[in-house]
């Protein structure tokens, strides 16, 4: 998983920042359960950016996951599952002075199709989103991922969903894409909830 650092606006933006995942391989679904329109630019329902990461929850199984990045630095993310299916992943914020992870929510990766923002969720058709919201910015990053930015909410789309040659962009610098063309069945693969600055 490629990650980049982004500032965390949780009341003291000088002290903390959140890692920003650029892709995820987890795809979760719970079938035909009713959707919950609880994604906002502040968090996912009761889970808010800047709040303490809970150790337990009555509705979810919680599992910390340790990974090592390209620079051999350990990072811990926290998976929230229901009935054995990962629903979302919490990324702790970082403390600038020590570069250590805090126990506060820095960002949330939604991988379940059960949560939406204004009706848009994992599995939503990308072309329908852009048609209904023509002013949303589309960016391309690192030959892997397109992002549709909507304030503190970013819809992530695999580059395989793009129709035509991929845009040329500087390495590791998100670049705006003018008049993007996605395949008819292009879908949102995950949703990243993050601080805005």
Label every PLM stretch briefly:
Residues 9-142, 151, 174-197:
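Short helix/turn-capping signatures at newly exposed starts of structured segments
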Residues 4-7:
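C-terminal motif of bacterial Sec signal peptides marking the signal peptidase cleavage site
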Residues 139-166:
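Short aromatic loop motif centered on NTY/YTY
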Residues 165-173:
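Charged C-terminal helix
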């Amino acid at each position: 998983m490629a990650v980049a650092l982004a500032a965390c606006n949780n009341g003291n933006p000088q002290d903390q920042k959140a890692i920003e995942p650029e892709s995820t391989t987890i795809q979760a679904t719970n079938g035909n359960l009713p959707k919950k329109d609880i994604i906002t630019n502040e968090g996912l329902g009761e889970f808010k950016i800047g709040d303490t990461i809970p150790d337990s929850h009555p509705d979810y199984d919680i599992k910390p996951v340790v990974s090592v990045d390209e620079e051999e630095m350990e990072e811990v993310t926290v998976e929230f599952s229901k009935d054995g299916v990962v629903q979302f992943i919490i990324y702790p914020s970082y403390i600038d002075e020590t570069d250590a992870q805090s126990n506060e929510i820095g960002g949330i990766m939604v991988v379940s199709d059960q949560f939406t923002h204004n009706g848009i969720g994992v599995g939503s058709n990308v072309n329908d989103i852009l048609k209904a919201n023509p002013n949303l910015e589309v960016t391309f990053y690192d030959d892997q991922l397109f992002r549709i930015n909507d304030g503190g909410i970013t819809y992530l789309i695999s580059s395989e969903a793009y129709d035509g040659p991929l845009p040329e962009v500087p390495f590791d610098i998100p670049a705006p894409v003018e008049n993007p063309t996605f395949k008819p069945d292009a879908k949102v693969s995950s949703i990243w909830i993050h601080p805005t600055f």
